[in-house]
Amino acid sequence: MPGSPSARSVTPASPAASSALPVSPVGRPSSLTEPEATVSGSSSPADSSTSPSSSPLQAAPSTSVVPVSRPHTRSRSGIFKPKERKDGTVAWLAACLAAAVADPSSEPRSYQAALRIPHWREAMEQEFHALLRNKTWTLVPPPPRVNVIDSKWVFKVKKHSDGSIERYKARLVARGFRQRHGLDYEDTFSPVVKPTTIRLLLSIVVSRGWSLRQLDVQNTFLHGFLEEEVYMKQPPGFSNPDRPDYICRLSKALYGLKQAPRAWHARLASALRAHGFVPSTADTSLFLLQKPEVTMYLLVYVDDIILVSSSQYAADALVCSLGADFAVKDLGKLHYFLGVEVTSRATGLVLTQKKYSLELLQRAGMLKCKPTTTPMSSTDKITAVDGELLSPADATEYRSIVGGLQYLTITRPDISYAVNRVCQYLQAPRDTHWAAIKRILRYVQFTLTFGMHIRPTSSRVLSAFSDADWAGSPDDRRSTGGYAVFFGPNLIAWSARKQATVSRSSTEAEYKAVANATA
């Protein structure tokens, strides 16, 4: 009935009237899709019945028009159902399998594809059985009113420093972003060793001729004990056939959990204290053991450990003792640590990041760029307002490349100042800042083999040098200070950054630089 409040649709009186309606981008009249649209005409059904010449759209009361929204489909959410073939296989699974056969270094994007590839299926089974042996969880019926997270498989091809394949790694990762603070986790901070500590210890090792070994702990986070109750669904592809409805109550940490790094560090620190080690007050990831007959240091960066010992026998005994508690793998002499290549020479150790530099250049699309001999030009005056703003996608890429350059400064003090300059514009990068990054990358291309040379020395003297300009920043007139700290002839720490406050004189800026160098 025209005047019925239950009417839910309106039909135009004629094609002409239909074509006169404004059409929304989704192909529907905008007056029907936009809730804020108003309908002209009388609000009384009696009035509308007395106007036979008016169109049905005008005659319908405003309350009868129901806004129509686009349906929330799977394609709009980026969810696509795999196309099944007549033989029962799935198109994208077959494509992944063909890619894995053609390229052994390819990484599958789903656990369904990995299960069809022999070496990845073996890696998944090894990870799953390691979790069972470690008693990571216990299958329990789902308790009421608990937060149950899920998990996913992550695949990674581990490579040597020369690019050759070391092993295929499958890792079960919990979706920790579904955890709730105060319910599933509390504190999350976990320390890692500082680069300055690494360089200082390497300088001591070279000078004293001590043993230098590298250890790796397999399934690192699985050794940490959880203090909170965390529940997780059974791993995809490895559900218990007898108890498919049960869930996992985690008793030990798992990769992806918010508190996993902290739980692992607490477990490792407890084990090292049992062996007589104490953490350093300057760096809590440095553990020391000093006895009359032996001196040992352990540098811990999550699961990567550097073992320094004055006695080879004591180092072997410690590795065996730690192997009783953790799955410790002795990698032998230090050669590759956290993306840093360590080369032993008669004149000491050489630290380089050639492999990482090439990966960074490839990520930036500048692997075949024209090299340059300096990271910055003395005539370049970079400011925060010159140039056009980058698009959101380019700004994200800018921040990613800057972060990669920051990590490259671990062994490259020559680019420290230039990288600090481009770091000052992460909030709103412009095309002039991007040009500065490209020049730094061109310099990296020219100096791929540059690094640090740590020489043996009998000196135990710490020397520090500092310098500062005055009001050098054109944006806020703050000064830039820098320092370099040497242990004997070896450079172990440096910095070049803008000072936190404005200096009223060059003397004040210099004093601030000295304070930063000695802090």
Residue ranges and their predicted role:
Residues 216-219, 249-257, 279-309, 322, ...:
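Catalytic palm active-site di-aspartate
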Residues 233, 308-331:
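Active-site-proximal acidic secondary-structure segment that organizes catalysis
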Residues 76, 165-166, 184-185, 225-227, ...:
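Short coil/turn segments at secondary-structure boundaries
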Residues 139-144, 214, 278-280, 298-299, ...:
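Short beta-strand
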Residues 1-270, 274-281, 286, 387:
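Chromodomain-type histone methyl-lysine reader module
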Residues 267, 271-275, 321, 325, ...:
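Generic non-transmembrane alpha-helical segments
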Residues 172, 185-189, 193, 198, ...:
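Divalent metal-binding acidic/histidine catalytic loops
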